[in-house]
Amino acid sequence: MRDEQIKKLRRELLLKQFELDTVLGVAHDMTARDHTVDELYHMLRLTLQGQRNVVQLLLFAREDHGFKVRVALGCDLAEAEKLALTPHLLAGGVTNPQAVEDLHLGEAWDRYELVIPVLRQKQVVAYVFVGGLRDNDVRQQLIPFLGSLANTLIGAVENRRLQAQRVADAAVRKEIEIAQEVQAMLFPRSLPNDAHLAIERSYVPHTEIGGDYYDVVEIDADRLLLCVADVSGKGVPASLLMSNFQAGLRTLLRQGVELATIVPELNHLLFRNSGGEKFITAFLGIYDRRTRRLQYVNAGHNDPLLLLDDGAVHALKHGTVMLGIMEELPLLRVGETEIPAHSLLLLYTDGLTEVFDAHNNEFGEEGVLAVLQRNRYLPLPKLHQELLRSINAFSAHDAQFADDVTILSCRFK
């Protein structure tokens, strides 16, 4: 009798050693090189196929949208995918090994006898369903063994996903850095402040890479271009489209062409590069210091506001539709206006007006105009601060604006 007990203990010890070696071997193989997630699950399947006590097995792993069958032994994977976990299981409600019949899963689950949950940081990350168990000794032996194997696998899968996420995050960070560099190069480094006019700008991006653009270009000794634009989308694609827009604009300005030619050419350039999938709203104005006249085109953009010294307000509306959505512009009207002394011109993007309070009331052009009329004689930097302070106070989202905010103001002396 004693000899039989010793033999049994030796068999159990050898089995435990074999199981430990198996788990360690699997752990080594899974970390030896960068396996894909599918390869990791396949390695576990091959390991389990060599275990004579494992006849029926399913491994459900938690993924983004619930649990998914990743390993199936003793049945077809497509058949296993038809099995549905109960809400209790989906919520991670089974945290200890349990008889499947106690879960009342239905006849489709009759071949499975035991469910072994796999926990990481006290959260259920997988379930192992086992069937074909010969006796209670086999059941008790398999619980820690399969739990250890599954835990090793899930750990390797999580590490692989974290590694992939780190690579993806690094790529996104690099993309953001490139887009930020491109965007920084687009904006003018200095703005005119001379005997004829003074210009100020403010730019508050909603995300790390905004979709707004502004520019001031000295064409010759008398004329300069004022431009504010809003590009659809964000990120590198938007910054590249913005770069194309600026390059085309500056090339046309160097050639000495008029707005009536510049705008259709820019539209054609944008349509050719984006295929009509992206667009730009823009305001382009050319001011002549000598004649005090402003020629402009409003391409589907927010109307700039011109405040005269006598209190009159003019919205600069003439122009065309947004650029880049069609190959040929259906209409184009170049506006022209004289700028009296002591006038104030405000160009901006829709991030300044499309701000909503707790009752869903919009700040709008009326709100912008009200701030301008109260503060029009403030120094331009302080005027910008007051505009930003006003929309911040109005917004239901405190300092979080729903879009980029760009302000370009010009005071004519």
Label each PLM-derived region with a short phrase.
Residues F67-A108, L316-G319:
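Acidic/proline- and glycine-rich, intrinsically disordered low-complexity segments
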Residues E101-H104, D110-R120:
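A short, aliphatic-rich beta-strand micro-motif
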Residues Q163, V167-L346, D398-K413:
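… and, occasionally, acidic/histidine-rich disordered N-termini of signaling adaptors
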Residues D137-E158, N244, P340-A341:
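Amphipathic alpha-helical "output/dimerization" segments
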Residues P237-Q255, I339, S343-D398:
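Active-site-proximal, acidic helix/loop segment immediately C-terminal to a metal-coordinating Asp/Glu
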Residues K7, V125-L149, K234, R333, ...:
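Regulatory loop-to-helix N-cap segments in sensory/regulatory domains
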Residues M1-R33:
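Signal-transmission linkers at sensory-effector interfaces
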Residues R45-Q49, L57-K82, A221, V231:
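GAF sensory/regulatory domain recognition
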